[in-house]
Amino acid sequence: MKVSVLITLAVLGVMFLLTSAEERGSDQMDSPAWLKSMERIFQSEERECRWLFGGCEKDSDCCEHLGCRRTKPSWCGWDFTFGK
């Protein structure tokens, strides 16, 4: 429920920004460039290691405190260690 409210507010905010830009008389070429720059926020980052339940081939593929579980399909699972 909270997530859907936040998504709705984000969409309304973007719509407000786009309509206010049109009212100020900016040309249509500005809006697509602005939207392309905003794409970076929503793209996932490339990571060096795999998170919990991510696919793996060996233990070094997984993040710290995770080990590769070799059941089919292979996935990264907690190796029962703690620390920083």
From Swiss-Prot:
<feature type="disulfide bond">
    <location>
        <begin position="49"/>
        <end position="63"/>
    </location>
</feature>
<keyword id="KW-0800">Toxin</keyword>
<keyword id="KW-1015">Disulfide bond</keyword>
<protein>
    <recommendedName>
        <fullName>U21-theraphotoxin-Cg1c</fullName>
    </recommendedName>
</protein>
<dbReference type="GO" id="GO:0090729">
    <property type="term" value="F:toxin activity"/>
</dbReference>
<dbReference type="GO" id="GO:0008200">
    <property type="term" value="F:ion channel inhibitor activity"/>
</dbReference>
<comment type="function">
    <text>Probable ion channel inhibitor.</text>
</comment>
<dbReference type="GO" id="GO:0005576">
    <property type="term" value="C:extracellular region"/>
</dbReference>
<feature type="propeptide">
    <location>
        <begin position="22"/>
        <end position="47"/>
    </location>
</feature>
<keyword id="KW-0960">Knottin</keyword>
<dbReference type="Pfam" id="PF07740">
    <property type="entry name" value="Toxin_12"/>
</dbReference>
<feature type="signal peptide">
    <location>
        <begin position="1"/>
        <end position="21"/>
    </location>
</feature>
<dbReference type="InterPro" id="IPR011696">
    <property type="entry name" value="Huwentoxin-1"/>
</dbReference>
<feature type="disulfide bond">
    <location>
        <begin position="62"/>
        <end position="76"/>
    </location>
</feature>
<keyword id="KW-0732">Signal</keyword>
<feature type="disulfide bond">
    <location>
        <begin position="56"/>
        <end position="68"/>
    </location>
</feature>
<keyword id="KW-0872">Ion channel impairing toxin</keyword>
<keyword id="KW-0964">Secreted</keyword>
<comment type="similarity">
    <text>Belongs to the neurotoxin 10 (Hwtx-1) family. 05 (F4a) subfamily.</text>
</comment>
